[in-house]
Amino acid sequence: NITACPGTDRCKLANIDSVHLAREIDKRYFRKDMPGKIRIAISACPNACTSESLNEIGITGLRTPIRKPGYCTGCGTCVQFCQEDALVVSEGSIVMDQDRCLDCGTCVRSCVYGLLESEPTAYRITFGGRRGRHPKVGMHLITVNSEEAALLVIDEIIDWIYRYARIGVPIVQQLGVSLNFEEFKANLPKKIPADSIVCQ
């Protein structure tokens, strides 16, 4: 079961082409016989329109802003657009609070002078979320900088579940039993290109 928001084709807030990524995942795993139900949800930005963190596998598109301290005019347009109060004007320049920033990219798009740039688009991948009566937010697994790397991570997750999960038991209930998340997370960077990892 794969769900995706409209993505870059139809949404001005999108950071990634979520529909294309969903189609690529579907091509690889449609009708694959798995030991349990696997829901994959993709949101092209942190607005989380697909509630991706409440799925077994969640993918969120990120855009981390980069300030150019000597060039900012201090007009404050980005401050007005930021919904997290992560930006303030101080002594004629913009100061960013990294702890409050969600990497949504809104400030980058709002800069009328094009002085706010961004890191390469990133894909934050979570695992172990659950919907229903007892919802659970998925745990951060890894953040990568390309669709190709995101697909490699999904390949590793699916293979891991296929090999070790028990049939008929919800995936979330197997974490720490059949599925050792911490061990999987620790070994994952060895299986994907090092230059594609943003953070783990």
Residue positions per predicted region:
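Small-residue-enriched alpha-helical segments and adjacent helix-cap loops
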Residues: 1-77, 81, 100
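Short glycine/threonine-rich loop-to-helix capping motif typified by GTGT followed
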Residues: 8-18, 49-55, 103-106, 175-193
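Flexible, glycine/charged-enriched surface loops at secondary-structure junctions
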Residues: 34-38, 90, 163-176, 194-200
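A domain-level signal for the structural core that forms small-molecule/cofactor-binding pockets
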Residues: 57-62, 120, 125-131
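Iron-sulfur cluster-binding cysteine motifs and their immediate structural context
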Residues: 77-96, 106-123
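A hydrophobic, small-residue-rich beta->alpha segment in the mid-to-C-terminal subdomain
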Residues: 129-166
